[in-house]
UniProtKB/Swiss-Prot annotation:
SUPFAM superfamilies: Release factor. One of its GO terms (molecular function) is translation release factor activity, codon specific. This is Peptide chain release factor 2. The modification N5-methylglutamine is found at residue 250. PROSITE patterns: RF_PROK_I (PS00745). InterPro entries: PCRF, Pep_chain_release_fac_I, Pep_chain_release_fac_I_sf, PrfB. It comes from Mycolicibacterium smegmatis (strain ATCC 700084 / mc(2)155) (Mycobacterium smegmatis).
Length: 368
């Protein structure tokens, strides 16, 4: 094997060893053993919330261990692959080994990004809200396209998605939608998506086929856990009930099952209509309200810290990514400069490259 390839393999070994240390592989094995014991408890499903968390945590831990062990095995096999290529003496065998080296580098770098998720709430599940912005019906359609993009991303990773509320626009698309992604580190991963997303395309709703620019805002919150102590006095909440509605304003329920919660002190409003009963919708809406209040508390603490540090802090609420479908095709993140020339793939949920670039960018910003 030539020295350059040996150096590449040695560098990957150093990176993977660091990843294994940060992830604490031995500790991960012990955690899996404990979760397997918990999962085998015949009384586990007496508490469905705890049961779902145990099974979800077990699945994630097992997948993470398989992933890092698989990378180690592939890296150990790589020198052998080059030896076999040298013995065969053909260019095709060397090209195959080089392709595996390149793919392994990509996979190890992706795993390395996981070690950067060390924020206070990064390991939490996520609550995502998408709102249409300027651009009329095109913006509503764009908001629905973004919702589909994130749900497709979750599906590709086998992450369960729970839709809390969808407010449909009159002609097409959605005014807003709120859903949860139930996966460890979903918040740390998706939080880099928070901000304004811009779409440029030929409008399918314009009779003259003119180019239209549309905007939609993405908000990402961590799911609240019992340890967060987000207590809301009953007198601080106004509860309104109404009938669930579907596309075009049509009623999809003959009972007043949809719930709107208004937090009186802050004016925060949360709606939920996707569950079958009023009680279920109220429980789901309360979870989202708690997440919003937790985020409000976190931002207030961050503002106080920024004031003490003498800077104005940073805001994610600005335009952060542009999706151009016409006159050329390009999706570009304006913070990281990461770009992809295949918008169809991105809109179908292939956003891992943007997420990884965003996490690395955020980590560098936090270090500054």
């Amino acid at each position: 094997m030539d020295p350059d390839r040996q150096a590449d393999i040695a560098a990957l070994d150093t990176t993977l060893t660091t990843v294994e240390r940060v992830l604490d592989v031995d500790g991960l094995r012990n955690r899996i053993e404990q979760l397997e014991k918990d999962a085998s408890d015949p009384n586990l499903w007496d508490d469905q919330t705890r049961a779902q968390k145990v099974t979800s945590d077990l699945s994630h831990a097992q997948n993470e261990l398989r992933r890092v062990e698989g990378l180690r095995q592939r890296l150990d096999d790589l020198p052998v692959l080059y030896e076999l290529a040298a013995e065969a003496g053909g260019p095709d065998e060397v090209a195959e080994a080089d392709a595996e080296l390149a793919k392994l580098r990509e996979d190890i770098e992706a795993m390395e990004v996981r070690t950067l998720l060390s924020g206070e709430y990064d390991e939490r599940e996520a609550v995502v809200t998408i709102r249409s912005g300027a651009g009329g019906v095109d913006a509503a359609d764009w908001a629905e396209m973004l919702m589909r993009m994130y749900i497709r991303w979750a599906e590709k990773h086998d992450y369960p998605v729970e839709i809390f509320d969808t407010s449909y626009a009159e002609e097409a698309g959605i005014k807003s939608a709120t859903f949860a992604v139930h996966a460890p580190f979903a918040y740390g991963t998706l939080s880099v998506e928070q901000g304004t997303h811009r779409l440029v395309r030929i409008s399918p709703f314009d009779n003259q086929s003119r180019r239209q620019t549309s905007f939609a805002d993405v908000e990402v919150l961590p799911v609240v856990e019992t340890t967060d102590h987000i207590e809301i006095p009953e007198n601080d909440i106004r509860v309104d009930v109404y009938r669930s509605s579907g596309p075009g304003g049509q009623s999809v329920n003959t009972t007043d099952s949809a719930v709107r919660l208004t937090h009186i002190p802050t004016g925060i409003v949360v709606t939920c209509q996707n569950e079958k009963s009023q009680l279920q919708n109220k429980v789901s809406a309360m979870r989202v309200l708690q997440a919003k209040l937790l985020e409000r508390k976190r931002l207030e603490e961050r503002a106080e810290l920024d004031a003490l540090k003498g800077d104005g802090g940073s805001s994610w609420g600005n335009q952060m990514r542009s999706y151009v479908l016409h006159p050329y095709q390009m999706v570009k993140d304006l913070r990281t400069e990461y770009e992809v020339g295949n918008p169809a793939s991105v809109l179908d949920g292939d956003i891992d490259g943007f997420l990884e670039a965003g996490i690395r960018w955020r980590n560098r910003k936090d270090d500054d």
